[in-house]
Amino acid sequence: AALFEACVDAAMRGATLGEITRAVRIQDQAGATVKPVTLWRAAGPFEKLRQAVEAQTEQTGHRPTIFLANMGPLKQHKARADFARGFFEVAGFAVIGSPGAKTVADAAAAALQSGASAVCICSTDDTYPEIVPPLVKALRAQKPDLLVLLAGYPTAQVEAHQAAGVNEFIHLRANALEVLTQIAAQLGVQP
């Protein structure tokens, strides 16, 4: 109460609010120092990757393109084809979809005719053992350096698919930024 009365008295004598505040705070102790939180945008690294893809597209006149080699009827490939499209579009890659091919030869012909920079095989774990080796062989016979990707990660089949020539797997547990950055580098995108 005495402090309040002293402040009122000082104001009546012409003291400013700033002067009163400074006079009152003389006896205050320094409080805790709070370090501000550093702002970080989680989307930043993805945006940087996408900008690198855009820069390459402007420089070369050609956007890195991935062909989805969808195998079999719609119910066999749709889930993985939709996942793959969204996965690749995050980085700014163009994605060419395809109707489900009935044969490996049809899928290889469509993929090669598309002129895509990479091919992603989309089907089910159960069908991959009979599809992947002959499809990769057919693709590489015409384009030995073609980047071949597989939608999914069939754990028991990974080594066999890598031996057949699959370069990378895209799946729900993949580190999307890391995988997309590796794919971009293999397609010639400079960071």
Language model features by range: what are they?
Residues 1-191:
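Domain-level signal for soluble alpha/beta catalytic cores
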